[in-house]
């Protein structure tokens, strides 16, 4: 764009760019230099000489000016003549400028030439040409021939490209070319100069008259023209902008009518600017001799202004009032930007920033400045020309300077975006709504914008946006790329692509980049509409409902919900430089608003679902919704792109209804993301980690109502409804945790809440994890519980409300950080997860029946488990578990449901209990299982196998296996929420599947084996982090089968079934592909001891008691554990992992080592992968061991204490770091992400002090792969061998097998104890 010569010129050198250019530049520049003294106006590149020469050239050339305006002053100027002479190539320039105008490439060169010529001959060309060009631009505008206008139009197009030199040079060149077109007979350069001199001195200098009106005379101009030229350049900068604007006839557009209204604005500013800032007196005093560069600067920046002003000025001499108007704008722009600071940068540099965006700026500028562009973009121009002049010139310049506004077919959109001068007008998406949405009325406008967005259309955008959109786009400089895309989808996509906005931390942060785009991409119209809505809600954090809507929905669809869709389209970002979107996402009133709006959103979502939108979509959205404020923040911070990734999956999975739902959900969700990024309000909320809890509370509120109604709706009044809806409701119940709230919202959330949380893995992991835990238990309660324990589900909602609410609060805190950093990967995983969830949702309908058996404990446990499942599923889903189990957190409900369903045939009650317990806690499931013992366990095992295998083989069993996998996944989720989480979860799922596959072997063991999976599953379900091992143990047989299945589905090497005899080290090495020190795996022994303690404790508790203890540990700690588990998962997910996971994990790690060791041993210890699971499973295992050990009292207390501590620590850490600073938060998120991933890997080692980092990684990997393979193989073998023992352990002889399991589990817990890692 800028040649060396341009740079030299900009720096004051007069490069001989062309033979003519050097000639003119030289002659002009030299004249500037040598004529500078002569004119005494060397300020302007020999400006005086320029004035004199230009006076002559203009007089002679101007005489021939076709344009009377330029001819009227007939500014023949020797200099201009000289310029023409020196620019004899300038004749080429003029001629070629025509070509250059016609061809942007030439324009670039010509622009450079002009820039150089102007800068070189700035004295003559700069002031005179600027004036000339201004006058000529104006004269051309109203008096130039159409071809000249077209040339100007061409210049406009080309200037858009080479806005920098192109714009102001084009202005000069446009004048020259226009004059050339007019006065082709005349010397091209001189003609342009002359005509310009005539008209421009007359008009422009009249406009600048205070300084140069008398000087407009050729001699008067000589002296004053240098000054006016100095002004002129500044004015011309803007004038140039309009001239080249996409209006071939910028100068020739509505010559007088638009110019007087619009151009006069720049003209007057040019006048005033020229007088005030650019005027010979001002610029001269300002810049003195440096005026040369200021001339360049004027040429570059003021050039656009001056171009505008000049065109306006030249055209409407009597439009001085407008000039007066524009001067403030232009002057504000010019003085700040065109003055020494702006001038300091060479005009070349200066101009391009303006000019590059100027194509858009030009668009708005002409819009403002003149209708010349009105012809081009009449709708935009008028509006833009109206608003832009007043505040947009600065924004305009910003547009110019900010080529950020994409030079896409929709300049109006870019203008508003680029015009960030307004500030927080986050209208990055669509011009229409941008136009509708003003800073003053973002909520209504965003609402309207949503409507308008629905009816988005470049024309509409152009027409509506110009005034508002321009400014709002100015406010959101990043927005340009978003709004630039004419298509809504593309706009949204562009906004998602403008994830830099998030990165910029600008309002656009969350707006388009994060979720809007994905959703928009989801459904162009919906996305755009949603984008508008999100902006509306986010744009004005003060608007609670839109915000809460946005918070609930934005989040649902904005970050996480849009993770897949947005990721695809945006990855954008999110990209996903989702650095700070999430800060904005949480709305202050979100908790309150979320309660209502969330309910409303839930209602809407439910309505959408009811409308036939996939429940998965709604669930996804809801889970995103739940996660919206906190997790969305976090993901906006770190995982916007991940969310987008998830969103595309979500969009893919729920594209049918998701896209249908997306508009609503998006518009509901978008505000949140907008809030996250849109206000830099996001910055307001970014600090508000409380909003994380807020959001979780909001989620609680929204999901709570949703959950209860879901129970009521799904379960009818009772939670007995079902399946997907019940699960969804349960999810929301988990989120809501409030009997009252749950009931109201559930109907709406039925199809969407559970699905939404299920889907939004990130949220599921964090806030949604709790929600899903609650939902899982709610769903479990709902399905079977509806029959046996409908109330408990409600009770669960209520009793767990306190626990879960606390958890939710902390989870919210956690959610923010946890979801933020870790959720980048988690979001990505969730994209996959959601897809799987979508698949699973087919089977997940009845996933919550089984949970209901243990609604009371399911309350807590299901919450925990549900959350774990959710996290696991979400984590696992991304892991690539094609199994439906991962597909949806609902799957975890489906898991319990599947089990419930599977057991249902045999023991509808028992299995729901046993499955529910297995899923939620052994309390009920264990007693049932142990009471039902063989049958339940057997059937459960069968059903586990069936469910897992079916899940593996048949959708329903797959659904069921998915929950198991999901439960296994929570270990990973907790342990390794990051990149490894996919594999980890997948490995966990696969390992679980492998275990499950071996479960048939265990099934051969009869009830014990089956019971163990049942117990394990409940433990896994209950202890998201801890149960995974149990889950795996439970799922060993199925794990094997499913391992193959998942291998098929996920093509994971890790899925390869591992020989049961394969040693942990071998498995770890095989999975990790690296040598794993046995010592790193040795924590197994240590864990064995630890586990033995809890296991005897569990044994002492008695099979049912131990299991029930585990259940109670989960049930009791459910609140804590939900908190802890949720926290643990959150922590694991990343945010809590490093800060929270450490503090709470340490105490829990001990218990986890004891308690966790056993369950982990069951499922995880056999495999190093399991160890990493242990990293996540340690918590689970800890819970499990709590359960197992009769640490029901100790464990729950400790767990309660730990969760409290964890929550406190989390809150402190989450509240503290996020509140510290967004950047700090973002850094922290990234740090946490890295640390979480590393800790997920290293937490294995950190968990067991003896475990080395390589083992951490190995265990992490082994936990991923081995979790899949080892779990399938060694755990399989171990469980195959010990499952009966473990089953007995569960059934009554948990000590030995559990000890065995504990050995492995303990080492696993130690090796992978996230708390230890976190503590580290």
Swiss-Prot record:
Transmembrane feature ranges? none
| Extent of Pro residues compositional bias | 255-267, 338-356, 404-415
Task: Say if the entry is tagged with keyword Nucleotide-binding.
Answer: no
Pfam families named among the record's database cross-references? JCAD
Report the residues modified as Phosphoserine.
486, 851, 1027, 1033, 1245, 1248
GO CC annotations? Answer: adherens junction; cell junction; cell-cell junction; perinuclear region of cytoplasm; ruffle membrane
Q: Which stretches of sequence are listed as region Disordered?
A: 1-124, 183-202, 209-233, 252-426, 452-492, 676-720, 741-802, 835-942, 1085-1116, 1153-1174, 1275-1320
Going by the entry's taxonomy, the superkingdom of the source organism is recorded as Eukaryota
Q: Where in the cell is it found?
A: Cell junction, Adherens junction
Q: Per the record, where are the segments of Acidic residues compositional bias?
A: 849-859
- Which ranges are annotated Basic and acidic residues under compositional bias? 108-119, 308-329, 1292-1303
Q: What is this protein called?
A: Junctional cadherin 5-associated protein
Originating species: Mus musculus (Mouse)
